[in-house]
């Protein structure tokens, strides 16, 4: 990853820190493919760039498979946010303003190594990745291996296991969608615990739906997203009241 200003590429084990602790994971970061930005483009355009793919010799077909997967997930994620808009009694295209024609979306391939036997005997709870919220609109997690470890936090602050179910994706709400829906769609706090000793590595493939880097959120009222119907916001207020006034589930 250090070879590219796009932050796309490979990250070694234990290279990141979340909530003050080292994450025990290694990963590849990819995105829907884009050319290098033109000279004079804003610095944030460096995020839109070609991927650093493994060689075809080392992993035959890898690039084609994941390019196709990102294309299909891109289409599905746009359709999904259209359904969210409809569910909130907004126009189906309420979110379209925030997508480029060639919108960049991102994908990770993540490996979480198992705890060592010594750590497990000492009662260590390994941090695969610490508690956090995704920043984008929505994310879609494919749990590749049959490992527990993914947990989500409910409004009471309790961590709930999210075990893998074959043939399904785990969908999470990101902070951008929470902002666009005036808090009706609450972003999901989640974490991953390291696999138990001897169980092998946990593998997962999260896909992150992006938004335009130059989107202006002060234009909400013009596109309808800012005009969330009062009855929808009232449902959210009732849930907050039911949970003792708690409006943020972050406990880290």
Language-model features, listed with the residues they occupy:
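Peripheral, non-catalytic segments flanking oxidoreductase cores
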Residues: 1-252
């Amino acid at each position: 990853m250090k070879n590219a200003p796009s932050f796309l590429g490979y990250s070694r084990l234990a290279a990141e820190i979340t909530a003050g602790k080292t994450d025990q994971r290694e990963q590849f970061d990819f995105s829907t493919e884009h050319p290098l930005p033109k000279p004079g483009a804003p610095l944030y355009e460096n995020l839109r760039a070609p991927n650093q793919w493994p060689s075809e010799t080392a992993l035959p077909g890898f690039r084609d498979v994941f390019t196709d997967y990102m294309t299909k997930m891109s289409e599905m994620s746009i359709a999904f946010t259209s359904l969210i808009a409809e569910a909130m009694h907004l126009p189906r295209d309420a979110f379209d303003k925030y997508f480029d024609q060639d919108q960049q979306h991102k994908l990770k391939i993540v490996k979480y190594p198992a705890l060592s036997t010594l750590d497990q005997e000492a009662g260590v709870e390994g941090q695969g990745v610490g508690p956090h919220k995704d920043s984008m609109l929505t994310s879609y997690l494919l749990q590749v291996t049959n490992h527990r470890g993914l947990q989500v936090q409910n409004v009471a602050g309790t961590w709930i296991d999210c075990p893998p179910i074959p043939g399904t994706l785990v969908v999470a709400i990101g902070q951008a969608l929470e902002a666009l829906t005036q808090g009706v769609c609450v972003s999901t706090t989640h974490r991953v615990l390291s696999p138990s000793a001897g169980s092998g590595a946990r593998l997962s493939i999260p896909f992150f739906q992006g938004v335009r880097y130059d989107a202006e959120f002060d234009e909400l009222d013009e596109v309808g997203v800012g005009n969330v119907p009062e009855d929808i916001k009232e449902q959210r207020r009732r849930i907050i009241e039911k949970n003792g006034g708690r409006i943020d589930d972050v406990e880290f």
